Amino acid sequence: MLGRILNFIKKPTSKNIVINTIGNYLNVIFIAFFAFLLVRIMQPSEYGVLSVLLGISYVLANILDFGTTASIYSYLPVMIEKKHKNIYIFLKTIFSYQTGFSVIIITLLLIFFPYLDKIFFKTDAPSWELYVTTFSVLFFVWQNYAINALNAAKQFFKANLYLNLSNLIKTVIIIGLIPFKAVNVGTIIFTFGILGPLVFFLLLFFEKKHIFLKIIKAPVVKSEFRLGYTLTFFIASQFFNLALRMDLFLLSYFLSRSPEIGYYGLSQKIILTVMASIGSITQVLSPNFSNIKTREEVKHQFKIGFYYLLIPTGLFFLLFLTPNWVFYLFFTEKFAPTAAITKALSLAFLIYPVLNLPLLYILYTAKKPIHILTSNLIIFLTVAIGCYFTIPKSGVFGPPYVLALSFFLGGVVLLIASIYEYKKIPATAI
């Protein structure tokens, strides 16, 4: 038994997952420390505003991915393996289209954000904080693009090294702001959303200067964007990203400026932190799924993926079992309600990790993102409609039940679609 475990750990996939997981959890530690620090400086209502604005920034950065993540993981690993001459053309094209579309959306947001905040988000944040939030979106988009490219090239160590060095510098900056009493919503968003990504890119540029120059010189070729595949996954991923934030946005709508938004925002951040472990695993598994050719390979990758994804499933369960005093220790009793909210959310997310297996298969093996679009649309509608009716009655404890139901319904769709597509795969290599 011990020998099998050691052999499992020694596999290249396991090593990459260990590297990526350690890196992601260093990032998690920084995020936890930021929360640990900020809840001691900011009032719950102020932290609630920060949670909403950062949530908007993160959601928009994911929206403005435009499905390029799927293209990068589907095609870049094969291009690198075969030393394809279009590697830099591919990277330049993806970056150019993504940036161009992002600038259009960000410009519209700059114009309408104050109005949207007034009628929907109701944070009452000053205009300059809204504008800093808007500009931070583009920097997050560029950082995500670079991280995806590094991961697709299996440069997991470097991606995590640069990200966590930028986290270290952000920590120093925030601590430096404390004596000047300059820690507020605006300065935190500026530090997280603009300075952090800038540091990341500077570190990457110094080490990969030759690649930067080749990408700059490469032409933009429209066919490399793969619009049909990319656009479908883009729409699908946006429904899911919005679903994960819709609970907080609707809480902000119904419970404007209430401390409960701060409690829930902190709980959501804890859950999203655990979800980082899922990303660290799927980022490594994705290239493997893109190379599947037979049913035996499907079974093999599902088996491997299932073992790895039991880790975040176990983390959600451990989070549910965590004593309340642990939450009080890290976040103070000022945020005491966070403990119960986090436990409720952890149960809701318990089945989510394993749902990534059929998702990876459909996206990278079958290359049929339309099924993911259907699943994510159901998840989004369930969360949006469910939270709209449960929040006025149950407050912050309404969304966890709705999220659990949404994952179940979305999972059923993914499972049925996977079985349907599996039947099309040849049993053995031809």
Functional labels for PLM-detected ranges:
Residues 65-81, 152, 248, 271-295, ...:
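Helix-loop junctions and terminal segments of transmembrane helices
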Residues 52, 127, 131, 160-211, ...:
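Hydrophobic alpha-helical transmembrane segments
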Residues 12-69, 106, 110, 136, ...:
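Signature of the first transmembrane helix
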Residues 139-162, 290, 349-375:
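Membrane-interface junctions at transmembrane-helix termini in multi-pass inner-membrane proteins
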Residues 1-13, 185-190, 201-244, 291-297, ...:
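Interhelical loop/hinge segments that connect adjacent transmembrane helices in multipass membrane
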Residues 16-27, 53, 65-114, 295-316, ...:
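Membrane-water interface segments that mark the loop-to-transmembrane alpha-helix transition
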Residues 14, 113-133, 258, 321-351:
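Interfacial segments at transmembrane-helix termini and the short loops linking adjacent helices
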Residues 38-59, 126-127, 222-229, 233, ...:
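Interfacial/gating helices of multi-pass transporter permease domains
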